[in-house]
């Protein structure tokens, strides 16, 4: 029963695989493939198949359990399913022969039979023999599967005879076939079935295979199966066929041809491979690893099938290839990304076509590496190439690897970039050309559509080249520009017509009649018509403008952030805050004044004498003054000391003040120069603010040997210099005494120093002042128009650069306070800076003592706004007009600027206001001296202005004279004249430093109120207030006339008839008196009588006014009025420092407006105003104005007391522009007459040597020219260096040689050259203008001028030759007479100036301009010689001719035809060109007598 229940065991067969075996001699160097055949059948998976099996074993391996000392291997068993579904188990035995690895002979075994007999054995026995897997198993049996041969014995059921049909293995096929034949014979004896397996058919040799088939065909039932263990082809078929032969029930064996079986197997592999590759394609991250992926796929059937067929190694290789492809794809994308971003990088680093157009690729690479943005676009990797670094994984780093640029692709992109730039340049050029074409089409108006214009440009080349989108874009841009420009011009036109809008009160609404009037006036303007197609926009702009005019605020200002009010507030907020910080530091450094350090400056031993006198009056250097003891540290320095500047200021000695003592014109001139240098250097270096504020005191020494001879001259000169320098002047006390210095002088000077120091401490006190406005002596409003083309700091610099400037009352963000000496006292002046639109409310509602009206000479609208504002200002209020432009040259080169500046001066002349020009390129005008005369005028009229203001506001009596402001509690002492440091960084001429800065000189009309000092300077008459001809009140006391003294005959620089001239000048009264009695001539008067004595010497102790005059008996019955001004308003007189001489006259009429005083203003207003004024008609207004002003003009002569001197400091290159009143015809006639008389009295010309500008000793500068050159180097080294520097770096500098360079830089250049002749100017970082100034200074310092004095007359005569060619040849012959050294240098300099003039379109320096700048330097004129004044223009034209005709004079070239060849100037009537007694300069551009017809006495022309 049990047996029946047991399942039947599947049949089991043992197959023995046999074939050629033995030593290498028998079988060759490889086997016939028995082991591979067994391996592939038993373990068919690719990972379990081992292609290498060895038969050479060691004794140990041979004796191991796997081989077990047998010459056969047990491969295990495999269960196989037949086609009928019946299973069978097949045990596989391989019969082989193992070779000893020592002897290379077969191992000795228990069976000693040869292989042929052993292989044919049907019974095999080996106890505990293990299954063989691979060679590595031997010796390591425990690491592999251990499976024993069943029961240690097996019976062989069939044989599989292997025959190798491949080539090679160093054996002959015939020998193998012979061996096989013998083996087959033995196998046949066993009566077991045999099948031949043709192995290695994948490397089959057909001939061998045919022999095998032939061999088999000769045998009965011997089948041949073609196999390949490598590709697993027909392996299973061999064993299946053998089993079928053993078991007849399984059917007949089916042998498949090799090729068919191979194809079937390969198809199976390809299908599995495709499925596996698709499986691998699901992996997209090239960072994935095989281990991770295989673990995820190990259960997938496609994965398992491929692993079985191809193995893990191939699967890994397939995966690796896929990962590599992913990586390469990623790299490719990154490369494409980099290549695509290269154009953008090139555009960033190499945007300029001109720079790279001619560069090759390598040069472009080097250029890119130098760019600052290189690191933003490219990254230089430490390792290359870039695609093998981790940079490929930095997705967020978009920088391009620099080594990528070494590829051809990158170079191609660069070439494309260059071509793109070329094409883009062409496209832009065409767009711009098209734009210019549109600009040339005049009929294109703002707002015109493109369709109306397109038909006119269809044939244009540029239009055809660019695209339609480009053409529309260009036209749209053109339309925007012309519309914006038209709107700006329309707005500017509205400002130019400011008089049309500013006639209504603020916050008013314009009526329909007014609007109609506005449209009527404006409709005639082309700028109004230009916006015809944009009428709504035009109306909007007009209404916006009107709305702003009638409701002006800085928030709604049409200039936006460029509103003057906003800019002023911002500037003052920062500037005043910085001043406060500086004051705090200065205050803490200057509080101790128990010890006084005094610097005493003098000439010819005067300083030491004064120091000795002070020590005589001291006790152990302690000086008693006003009950206090001061320790004095005196440091006298003589003018001849070479280290005078270095001695002034040291770390150990910081002076509190400087006593400047003089007793002659020379010593006074030296003092003026020295103080100017100190202040200039202090302001430029700004190393110590205290040095800038150093107080100076001028002390006049007594002259024991010539008492009263030239004392008046020195007194006048000293007082004038003190006024200019804003410092005290200590006069010689009255009476006679034997010593040079009086104790009272020393005490007065010391008090002045102490008071100055005390005042400076008050000014710089860290406690904010912010005093109430009521404490201000004067309130000035400065007006400027919004949007003018200059910065507000330019017009405010005269105030902000002054140390006496401080903040105004808290809350007043647009005001500042000035402490300034006006008259004889220090005054507090409030300056309020406003826009014109903000000033209108101030003009109507607040008290203003004076207006400073600023306008741009480049802008008509600025002048229009000024006219509109000025027209409504009361004529009692003084006005200062200020025209602002870039440089002096603008007046000569720009007609529009010339017209506006002329109009400004013309208006100023008509209303008797002051006028000045301010240049942004000039430093000199940035000083408060610009407004000093204006402040004096305002202070003089203060009471009249306040009374008029009260009269208008309270409607009280016009005779009311009470001051609006409370009198200032401050009391000013006579010696409280403190200097303004920053204001005087450059003292007025003649004390300004050498340079090209424009200087303010009074016009001839202004000089009628002045006398000329010994230096050619004008100064007010001593002790006389600064009154003007144009005042309405003519009851002015005459000037005090000091008693004349007989001068010494040897006084330098005096005209022969000095005494008579002085007396005549002092005796003249330029004012019109109330009496009609004619004045006596000066020569008819007794020189010892008729001189008014100042009453301060008599009534000072009684508290009377300083300006009361006592009149002696007058033998000529001349009437001189005496006014006792303390009768009315004594307190106001004391406050102002002037007599109230105007209040009475002005109290008799109601003030008018300036538009009724100016024909220009009224004509403008009349053209606008259509309605009738309520008070009077236009004619009545003019008649009234004329009647009140009739007869107030009277010409006044200048007093030619002294000859001008040192005019090379007077700004020859830049003539001053300053005038403040009208000029009389008689004056010009008198001057012309005087010049003719002076020519008759001319004297022999003397050699003139100006003093050197240097303040240090030099062994080079100032030396004779012959000492500085050699035959090898005929040009001085310094001249060569300067010229080379200028021509290398500055030929195109605007204003070269005209614009002044920094004087400190000029001095440093010469000092450095003194120390080292090999200096490099470029390394000094100095400006071209500084080098140009140093070059001019070199020639100015030469002992003799470059053009010798001896040849001046010949040059003058040659220049008068009418014929141009003859004149040039005559000049050429004269030049040949130069000393050889002078000739070489002169040729070098003129050649250089010719090169400069060739760039005149850029640097604006024509030959004419250069000659103006250079001829005084080259010819060294003697301005003391009046005869010379009439020939200045001729000398200048000579130098201009040399520059223009440089090639002709020096290089035998042809005469150059110039557009403005200078003709010889007329020799007659020189007075029409140059005024006598005026420092040489170009004709003043803004003086009415030179640029416009002479004004009549009545400018309105009513009579």
From Swiss-Prot:
Against InterPro entries, the record matches this protein to: FF_domain (IPR002713), FF_domain_sf (IPR036517), P-loop_NTPase (IPR027417), pG1 (IPR039007), Rho-GAP_domain (IPR051978), Rho_GTPase_activation_prot (IPR008936), RhoGAP-FF1 (IPR032835), RhoGAP_dom (IPR000198)
Asked if the Swiss-Prot or TrEMBL record annotates the protein with the keyword DNA damage, the reply is no
Here the segments flagged for biased composition (Basic and acidic residues) are: 1141-1151
Q: Got any disulfides in this one, which pairs? A: none
Entry comment describing in which tissues the protein is expressed? Expressed in spinal cord, cerebellum, kidney, testis and lung.
Outline the extent of the pG1 pseudoGTPase domain: 590-763
Biased segments, Pro residues type: 1036-1045
Gene Ontology CC annotations of this record: cytosol; endoplasmic reticulum; plasma membrane
Q: What is its main location?
A: cytoplasm
**This protein's domain notes:** The pG1 pseudoGTPase domain does not bind GTP.
Q: What is this protein called?
A: Rho GTPase-activating protein 5
State the organism named in the record. Mus musculus
Encoded by which gene? Arhgap5
